[in-house]
């Protein structure tokens, strides 16, 4: 029988651990909840000011919602005079999702000013305010929608 050194044992353990993590992740990915048909539609008003380092993750957390992003969620990004690459990143996502993302620019006036300006462009019954450094749980809008539907039917 072949005797392995401690270094070889560690190497084999790393390889096997990596293999099983990948295998298990693939196996369990089949059990993710299905997309959910919404009861209502939602707008997000998001004030933007020099937050380029958060924007990619922010958009991805909304696009990957269990509630279908393309049909149910609208993001109104109000650029409050950013001097970094925030506008460029927003426009990249806006180009990919033109029906879901609106980009507005205004001179710097603060978070409240940007939110109030964004309110003028909301066309849905339901609204939430998020900041670009907020990353939403995958089920956020699903849970909101489910509860609105449940309590709306009670009245």
Tell where the protein language model's regions lie, with residue ranges.
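Glycine-rich, basic loop-to-helix element that forms the pyrophosphate-binding segment
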Residues: 106-122
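Short, well-formed alpha-helical segments that are part of the catalytic scaffolds
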Residues: 51-65
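A conserved acidic beta->alpha catalytic loop
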Residues: 61, 78-88, 131
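Cell-envelope/extracellular polymer assembly enzymes that use nucleotide-activated donors
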Residues: 40-45, 61, 74
């Amino acid at each position: 029988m072949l005797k392995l050194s401690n270094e070889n044992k560690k190497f084999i353990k790393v390889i096997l651990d990596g293999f099983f993590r990948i295998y298990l992740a693939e196996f369990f990915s089949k059990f993710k909840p299905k997309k959910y048909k919404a009861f209502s539609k939602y707008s997000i008003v998001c004030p933007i000011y020099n937050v380029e380092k958060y924007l990619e993750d922010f958009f991805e957390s909304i696009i990957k919602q269990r509630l279908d992003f393309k049909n149910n969620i609208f993001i109104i990004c109000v650029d409050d005079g950013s001097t970094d690459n925030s506008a460029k990143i927003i426009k990249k996502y806006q180009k990919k999702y033109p029906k879901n993302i609106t980009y507005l620019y205004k001179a710097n006036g603060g978070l409240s000013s940007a939110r109030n300006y964004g309110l003028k462009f909301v066309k849905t019954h339901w609204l939430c305010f998020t900041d670009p450094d907020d990353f939403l749980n995958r089920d956020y809008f699903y849970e909101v929608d489910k509860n609105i539907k449940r309590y709306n039917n009670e009245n």
